């Protein structure tokens, strides 16, 4: 484990039990498949935390040989699912529109989805960043509300585990626990084998 990356995530998650951790080769292949460099905070997350449940709420996709948690697979699946749901919403009486915090709707056009919340929300990067990081955004379960989550993945989890959680997760939301519960490779393999 990289001392700097590990200590960063150990500060974010006071209770950290790592799951399956991808190697650098898997991270590089995922970046090549997606067509952009993976943010430094995300790479550190993958190498320190791996597959699991963050804050009791979010599953962050990581490069893995298991479709249910693989970054490239999930990025495409979530984008397709959100697109299909938005298309259904557009068939209603009023046209669908994203209500983006700050008013810059173009962040949705540059979205790469990389995480899902237990409440039906989705996390995505605005891949226009140039400093080695991408802003993290949250698409609420209503598939309309888009809130700024943080300037990096560690910033996002720091914000949602603090009183500022309601600014990201929505009015009335309580701070999430500073906990990461990893899922072991053996468990992921059994789950993959059990699927039809």
Task: Locate the predicted segments by residue.
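Short, surface-exposed beta-strand/loop micro-motifs that present aromatic residues
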Residues: 121-128
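Compact, glycine/acidic-enriched structural inserts
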Residues: 146-167
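A surface-exposed partner-binding patch
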Residues: 1-119, 187-196
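Short acidic/polar mixed-charge low-complexity motifs
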Residues: 119-121, 144
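Intrinsically disordered, low-complexity regulatory segments enriched in Ser/Thr/Pro
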Residues: 132-141
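Acidic, proline/glycine-rich low-complexity IDRs
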Residues: 165-196
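A generic structural signal for short, non-catalytic loop/turn and secondary-structure boundary residues
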Residues: 106-107, 129-131
């Amino acid at each position: 484990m990289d001392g700097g990356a590990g200590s960063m995530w150990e500060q974010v998650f006071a209770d950290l039990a790592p799951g399956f951790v991808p190697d650098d080769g898997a991270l590089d292949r995922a970046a090549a498949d997606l067509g952009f460099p993976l943010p430094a905070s995300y790479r550190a997350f993958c190498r320190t935390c791996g597959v699991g449940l963050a804050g009791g709420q979010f599953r962050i996709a990581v490069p893995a040989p298991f479709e249910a948690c693989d970054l490239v697979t999930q990025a495409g699946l979530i984008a397709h699912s959100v697109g299909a749901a938005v298309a259904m919403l557009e068939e209603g009486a009023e046209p669908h529109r994203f209500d983006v915090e700050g008013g810059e709707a173009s962040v949705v056009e540059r979205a790469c989805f990389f995480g899902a919340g237990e409440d039906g929300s989705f996390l995505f990067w605005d891949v226009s960043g140039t400093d080695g990081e991408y802003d993290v955004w949250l698409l609420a379960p209503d598939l309309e509300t888009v809130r700024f989550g943080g300037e990096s993945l560690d910033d996002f989890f720091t914000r949602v585990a603090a009183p500022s959680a309601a600014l990201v997760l929505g009015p009335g939301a309580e701070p999430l626990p500073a906990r990461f519960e990893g899922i072991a490779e053996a468990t992921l393999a059994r789950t993959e084998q059990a699927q039809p």
